[in-house]
Amino acid sequence: MSEPLRILVIGAHPDDCDYHVGGLAVLYARQGHQVRFVSMSNGDAGHFSMGGAPLAQRRRAEAERAAAIASDAAGRPGSVEYQVLDLHDAQIVPSLENRQKVVCIMRQFRPDLVITNRPNDYHPDHRYTSQLVADAAYTVMVPNVAALTPHLSHNPVIAYWGDGFKRPYPFTPDVSIATDEVIQVKMRMLACHVSQFYEWIPYSMGRLEEVPQGESERLEWFAAQRLRAEASHADATRGLLARLYGPERGNAVTYAEPLEFCEYGGAVTDANFARLFPFFGPA
């Protein structure tokens, strides 16, 4: 058996990683691989009635609960973990200091695959997180950069999760992974982020009064909206799914998480593609 994969997902906020690739994380963990979610910020600005340390502590606890649900669903406690950095929300910048943080995180975890958002995004924290990952890509191999943390011998493959932004160019998927079998786990992971999906985001959209009070009713309300987006990823990558899984299975996929490879990461070959994405065998 080959060495387990090490999958590093870097987002700006303590719900970004699981929101975009939570299903993929569970699939990897179920196969014996290790997944780490990293939030560049502590999330201390994302609310309308609380902030600062209480919100940061709340959001870290939410993230840890989401990771625990993923690990439990994989049957491997600790196989999905969440690291939350103590940088202020809405204040992430592509500074040298922050680049060094990302370089050290990548070196210490030794990822085979790094996943983040594209640099084309509405939120400055998202844009700059993407830039920090790209800026760290080559320098993880340079011994005299962050010299006290042993450098990597290779540049890991980097991929972007899916989005709907069109300029300067639209998201162009290179791989799309079916998440039907874990989609309900993903919904339960996202439901851990109460401060976001049941409070801040509905408030910011003028829909706070629509949120049900009961836990199961809230989950049903949230999932009814989120599952449409999850299904849209499958519909948008239908041809790719059919090619990867075969026409019969690919055309039957309901939910998917697509990725686009970043040209600043390591090269993707037929051999390492098969190792990095061990999901496309016979149904």
What are these regions (language model features)?
Residues 2-5, 144-147, 152-154, 168, ...:
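C-terminal accessory domains and tails appended to enzymatic cores
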Residues 47-50, 169-173:
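Short acidic, glycine/proline-rich loop/turn micro-motifs
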Residues 80, 112, 156:
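Conserved acidic residues
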Residues 105-151:
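Active-site adenylate/phosphate-handling loop in enzymes that bind or generate adenylated species
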